[in-house]
Design a protein with these regions (language model features):
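Glycine- and small/polar-enriched repetitive beta-structure motifs of secreted/surface proteins
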Residues: 1-162
Length: 162
């Protein structure tokens, strides 16, 4: 399978699938699936499950990512602490950190940090259930909430508190 076939100095890695973790010199990585973690040169503590999950582009160094799903977080180069779940979830993230993407959808930005996106997809239509950004703004099914500031809503809303 060539999994980890050119890895020479890495410790505690597990690669399963065609050229999974092929050139990695970092440690504590787990990759299952063809091309999973393939171009991760020295990153560590990554978990990738699915075809091309956390594959990366060129030689790169990404650490502390969890990608589950085919092509999940596929283009990462230096981004870390990302969680992506679903087919092609967050596959556009290159250097963003601390993003959580659930569902078959891209992050709003390939380089921003602390993005949140929870979606559903039926093969033709994507519905964003919850989205958030590093400023604390949260969008919940068409309603915008701002943490630590003024609450703004669209549509019918009941607001209680001071």
């Amino acid at each position: 399978s060539y999994a980890g076939s050119t890895t020479s100095t890495a410790n505690y890695n597990t690669g399963l699938g065609y050229i999974a973790l092929n050139a990695n010199t970092g440690g504590y990585n787990t990759a299952a699936g063809a091309l999973a973690g393939y171009r991760n040169a020295s990153g560590q503590y990554n978990t990738s499950l699915g075809f091309s999950a956390l594959e990366g582009v060129a030689s790169n160094n990404h650490s502390y990512n969890t990608a589950i799903g085919g092509r999940s977080n596929e283009l990462v180069t230096t981004g870390g602490y990302n969680i992506t779940l679903g087919y092609q979830s967050g596959d556009n993230i290159t250097s963003g950190d601390g993003n959580i993407i659930i569902g078959s959808v891209n992050a709003d930005s390939a380089t921003d940090d602390a993005q949140l996106k929870i979606t559903s997809y039926d093969g033709t239509t994507t519905v964003n259930w919850i989205a958030g950004d590093s400023s604390g703004n949260i969008i919940h099914a068409g309603t915008t909430h701002s943490a630590g500031g003024q609450l703004t809503t669209t549509g019918k809303a009941l607001v209680m508190g001071f």
